[in-house]
Amino acid sequence: MQKIKKVCIYCASSENIDPKYFEATEKLARVLVKNNITVVYGGGSRGLMGRLADTIIAEKGRIVGIMPHFMKEVEFHHKDVNEFIFTADMHERKKQFMVGVDALITLPGGCGTMEELLEAMTLKRLGIFTKPIVILNAFGYYDHLIKMLEFSIEENFMKPIHSDIWKTFEDPEKVLEAIHQSTPWSKDALKYS
C-alpha cells in the first residue's frame, strides 16, 4: 500500500453553510495531520477552506495554498498558511493543484468546487491524471451529482469502467481508507475513454 504524503483538497469558500460541514472538515483535517500528510488547497481564509487551513495550522500540520494573484489582491488568501503559490490565473491554479499529489479529495462546495472535481475526473478519464479522486459525500451532499454521473453511464455517455474514476465516502475519518480502496488507474485510459 502506497504511503500518502500529499493530497489536494477542493472545498467551499462559502461561510453561510450548515455548521455540520465545518465539523466534517475539521475531522478530515485532523486525520491528515495525524498521518503527516501535506495538504494543498485553494488558499482561502473563508468557509470550509478557512476552517481546513485553521485546523491544520492549529494541529501543527503542513498546508500549501494555491491562488491566482487577483484573489490575493482582494484579500481572500489565508495569511497564516505555511506556503503560498500564486498563479497567473485559475487555469494555472488547477494545474498546480495536481502537481505531486497522491490523491484529490473533494469536500462539499459550490460550482467552483464541482468544476474542479469534474475537470479532474475528465483528466483521469483521459489518462492524464491517474491518482485517486475521492468525494466526501458528507450528509448526502453529493447524492444528486453521483446519481447524475451514474445516469451518464447508464445512458452510454460514459462507460461502466468510468465509475472507477471516483470513490465516495461519508465519514471524514475514513479518508485514507477511501483513498487506498480506490481502483488503480492507467495512463492508457485514453484507449477506453
PLM feature spans:
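A cross-family phosphate/adenosyl-ligand binding-site feature
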Residues: 2-100, 139-173, 177, 183-193
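Short beta->alpha connector loops at strand-helix junctions that form conserved
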Residues: 43, 67, 87-88, 107-109, ...
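Active-site/ligand-binding-proximal alpha/beta "capping" segment
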Residues: 92-127, 134, 184-193
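Alpha-helix capping at helix-to-loop junctions
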Residues: 113, 123-129, 151-158, 181
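Short glycine-/polar-rich loops that comprise or flank the Walker A/P-loop
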Residues: 129-131, 164
